[in-house]
């Protein structure tokens, strides 16, 4: 699901330099994509309320957006989820 606009900004703190996944370029790339795709305001998608900070996507679309393989995306999503950076919920 695309946000209503592709304008605006996200706040990224310098402390990110010390983040445990900062030195893994593919995980960092996926995390930044997630930050940029997150909804700024609540919205609805196919009758489901999507909260602020959440977004709807698929592994296939993340592969297309990042150039990573399905296995790479799944591995990095699992890492980000295990470390508490993201949560994954089926709609």
Regions found by a protein language model. Name each.
Residues 3, 20-21, 38-91:
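Winged helix-turn-helix DNA-binding recognition segment
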Residues 1-25:
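Long, low-complexity, charged/polar intrinsically disordered regions in eukaryotic proteins
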């Amino acid at each position: 699901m695309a946000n209503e606009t592709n304008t605006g900004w996200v706040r990224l703190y310098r402390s990110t330099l010390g983040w445990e996944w900062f030195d893994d370029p593919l995980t960092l790339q996926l995390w930044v994509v997630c930050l940029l795709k997150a909804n700024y305001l609540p919205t609805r998608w196919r009758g489901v309320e999507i909260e602020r900070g959440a977004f709807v996507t698929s592994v296939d679309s993340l592969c297309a957006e990042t150039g990573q393989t399905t296995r790479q995306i799944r591995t990095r999503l699992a890492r980000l989820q295990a470390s508490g950076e993201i949560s994954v919920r089926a709609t």
